[in-house]
């Protein structure tokens, strides 16, 4: 309906998410962290092919909300995820928070990651209000879908599973209380 809106999103996705200065895998983890936090099933059930090709595994997505306590994430990933967490949940950011980020990222990387998280969060909240489901748009396409969501039938089965990440009775959409590991 509004071509400029489409192109704004498409250009941001290409220039900031796909390309950009920060590690793509880190941006992908932050994107899914936001999805899990705001319960955007549309975005949370997609995966970056580029991130998968560079080593991100499906297990890396499984418990992002509890990233601080998990050994699967390195200190750089945890720092970036803490940035996504602070933006998503409006957490206070003190000097120690910024020192942690600056230990792992340049100023341009921090700007890009912060911008990407902010854009992602707004876009995901908007998509959630539209209640758009995969396979309603571009039916028959399976590109970038998470395992178990490649077809309309698979999506329905996965969403019925007891351990589906976006079930309303899960603890996914709860403001985190974790603190950075010492």
Located regions from the model:
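Hydrophobic alpha-helical segments
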Residues: 1-182
């Amino acid at each position: 309906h509004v071509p400029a809106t489409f192109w704004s999103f498409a250009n941001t996705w290409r220039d900031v998410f796909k390309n950009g200065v920060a590690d793509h895998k880190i941006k992908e983890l932050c994107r899914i962290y936001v999805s899990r936090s705001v319960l955007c099933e549309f975005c949370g059930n997609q995966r970056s092919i580029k991130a998968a090709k560079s080593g991100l595994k499906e297990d890396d997505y499984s418990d992002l909300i509890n990233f601080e306590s998990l050994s699967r994430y390195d200190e750089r990933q945890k720092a970036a995820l803490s940035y996504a967490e602070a933006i998503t949940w409006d957490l206070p950011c003190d000097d120690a928070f910024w020192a942690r980020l600056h230990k792992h990222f340049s100023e341009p990387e921090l700007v890009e990651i912060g911008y990407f998280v902010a854009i992602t969060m707004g876009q995901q909240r908007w998509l959630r209000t539209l209640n758009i489901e995969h396979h309603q748009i571009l039916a028959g396409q399976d590109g970038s879908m998470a395992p178990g969501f490649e077809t309309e039938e698979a999506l329905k089965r996965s969403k019925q599973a007891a351990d589906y990440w976006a079930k309303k009775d899960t603890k996914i959409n709860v403001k985190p209380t974790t603190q950075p590991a010492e």
